Amino acid sequence: MKILLSAIPFDNGKSGISVYIREVVKALEEQGHSLTLIVEDDGAKEFERFELIRIKKRNALFSMLYSLFVLPFRINWKKFDFCIMLAANRRVFCRYPIFTIAVVHDLSQYHVPVKYDKFRMFYIKKVLPYYVRKAQSIVAISNSTRSDLIEYWHIPEEKISVVYNGFTPIPAVETQKKKQILYISRIEHPGKNHLNLLKAFELLPEELKKEYTLVMPGAAWNGAETVFEYAGNSPCKEQFQFTGFVDFAKLPELYSQSSLYVFPSRFEGFGLSLLEAMHAGVPCACSNNSSLGELGQDTAELFSPSSPQEIAEAMKKILSDSNYQQELSAKGRAKAAGFSWQNTAKGLMEIYRSRRAFTFGVPFFTGTMEEALFQIDCMVREKRARHIAFINAHCLNIAYKNREYKQILNDCAAVFADGIGAKIGAKMLGYKVEENVNGTDMFPLLADKPYRIYLFGGAPGVAEKALVNARALNGKAVFAGCADGFFKSKSEEEIFAELASLEIDILLVAMGVPKQEEWINSHLDRLGSCTAIGVGGLLDFVSGRIPRAPMWMRKLNIEWCFRLYCEPSRLFRRYIIGNPLFIGRVFLSKLRRNK
């Protein structure tokens, strides 16, 4: 895959986001993808082995505006399959001409109100949400961030996927254990909550205060002077160590030396160092909010970050009980084992491969015919019953009112977009359908694959004629049998028996919407290893009963006009009334979603 990665801002490689960018880029590179990175000056050397779109590092205001309104017009989007914005809670584009995944790490500004100046708070609370919503897919790095995206930025739930961060395992080193409590974070007040940690240390029993040192590596950030001033005036100031920024190479020794890792941040999108400490076997205590409570559940001692007393009690409980230390150490190692940067990269790639739009709560694939065929091939190889559907504007109009049909579509293994109506509706809602993946165009492609196919549906005689014409294609597929959709030639039981005896791979069901989806759904357990696909009027076209539109009409996406010409009485209501109704419903849906 040719992937465009926005790697700004990189924060000189000294923040949690810079770790995320560095490790995801490395994992995608190891998977063999062709990467082009957008970088500012501070990231150019780090990523010089890649093709770069390099931009000058500017102050925050100009960087935000340049990324929004200039950079998107500098990019040759046609060179790439898709784009990942690795820090979309910091920088976004005003337009996304190709499928774009926007990764949002946290919305801490809603939980730490004085985190930034007024301009940045306006940018984060008003500008970013508008442009992030335009991205085709949004990734939250934790369920906590996902909840915030829904509550504060009003992102539709169906647009959000949770792809957890990984972490880089800390190598084990032989070193002597020290009586030290560790907290690795940039020194940022009030967000990182160093002040309450210092106060909590002061509340520890005297013997613990004398025995332990509180070590706090991290670069100075906004508000650091407040933390340093308090520490300098504390009666425990000799027990506090601020080491400054620590390179990754020095982390193994720090973790190995520590008796306790404490993470009192007021809010975190993820909290990488918590997993690093768990992997290293260090007993952990952390805040009970945001992603920290999510990661620390049942594996760390939790506390309220706003209460120095609770933080002190948590530290005391762990430091005073060696058995509890061993228990937390074992649980932490087990939790950390489930996270890796390779899994993060795979999760991002899976979002692209299965990219979907949602209209009226119905999910459908927005990729290409080739990718749709690959999905079908994977299902056939699995040798178990699967349900695939096609949807167009008419289908979505039915799903708008028919909850049972809508649920069936949600339960399908795959749903493909057929027709210009679904494409227009998706575009109105901020999605991009790349190709018209319709059953009629797909049929000859399936016929050229080594499948065993059964034709089921249509009026008496239609399936038989379609079978003759399908066999005349002389493709690799074996068209093994057929039955009409009125059960005149064969009963349901006879059809089920025939499907089993003929070892059918793909069952094409042509009964019309929603009848065919309801039939497949209610009989899925009787279909053995068949992949059942609802194909509407396909057999009418294959049999020659109804002609297809000329190629020029198909290329212009107006095949529906030809169908209306051929069957005006049957299709007048569907197209002349149904299409405007569909557009109106999509418009109302968009208004409700953006409230």
PLM region spans:
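Proline-aspartate-enriched helix->loop->beta-strand connector
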Residues: F80, E503-L508, V513
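Acceptor-binding helix/loop patch of EC 2.4 sugar-transfer enzymes
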Residues: I101-K125, I424-N436, F541-E559
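C-terminal amphipathic helix plus adjacent low-complexity
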Residues: K346, E350-F365, L588-K595
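Venus flytrap/periplasmic-binding-protein-like
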Residues: A417-I420, S529-R545
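A transmembrane-helix-recognition feature enriched in membrane-embedded lipid enzymes
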Residues: G421-M428, R548-K595
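Conserved beta-alpha
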Residues: K423-E498, L502
